[in-house]
A protein has these predicted regions:
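Amphipathic alpha-helical repeat scaffolds of TPR domains
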Residues: 49-83, 92-118, 131, 138, ...
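N-terminal cysteine/histidine-rich coordination modules
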Residues: 1-50
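Short coil/linker segments at helix-helix boundaries
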Residues: 1-7, 40-60, 116-133, 185-195
Length: 198
């Protein structure tokens, strides 16, 4: 995770909050390359799920206006919305790895929100997003190895906006998330999963 020093002129800077493109009307959210070129069946599914997206954001933050300058709250909400939107995409768009990247970035932003607003449950929500990222990174690797969903066509594997650690970075992140947020009850199963990611 890349952290930025606050500047005297602009204060705290969070470039991560601007990465997702959000339609302020229907709350469709995605990476820029997926935002403009949507096939009609996907657009119809996204439109049908519009109210679910409104409810999801309202449940976390209340009302967020995506017509104004992005805030930390709006940035975190945008990654959550992208997670919901990529559920409706076909496998040729590699939605699982994109959801994994969004879940990890959402975890980072919710963690920052938790530091700024400790009275809220953002730290707990951050841990949930880390666990979701673990599941999605693991699932993306499974789908890649079985040939059901390719991730090699992605321009940037992230995880941050200015770093591209490639396919090896995906494997590394999966192992790191497994180590930090994977189940800890069954040690044999835990060691087996970590060994698979070597």
């Amino acid at each position: 995770r890349r952290l930025y020093e606050p500047s005297a002129k602009y204060g705290e800077v969070y470039p991560l909050i601007y990465s997702m493109t959000v339609c302020p009307q229907c709350l469709y959210t995605g990476f820029t390359q997926d935002f403009r070129v949507i096939e009609k069946p996907i657009a119809e599914r996204l439109l049908e799920a519009m109210n679910e997206r409104y409810s999801a954001v309202k449940g976390l933050f209340g009302y967020i206006d995506f017509n104004t300058a992005r805030t930390l709250h709006a940035g975190a909400a945008s990654y959550y919305l992208a997670l919901l939107c990529y559920d409706h995409f076909d496998s040729k768009y590699s939605p699982t790895i994109k959801q994994a990247i969004c879940a990890l970035r959402a975890a980072w932003l919710f963690s920052t929100l938790g530091e700024k607003e400790p009275e809220e449950n953002y730290t707990y929500i951050s841990k949930l997003f880390y666990q979701k990222a673990l599941f999605l990174y693991r699932r993306a690797l499974e789908l890649e190895t079985t040939g059901k969903e390719m991730i090699a066509g992605l321009k940037s594997f992230g995880p941050d906006v200015d770093k591209n650690y490639g396919y090896d970075g995906v494997i590394y992140l999966c192992a790191l998330l497994e180590y930090k947020y994977g189940q800890k009850q069954n040690q044999h199963e835990r060691l087996q999963k970590l060994d698979e990611l070597k």
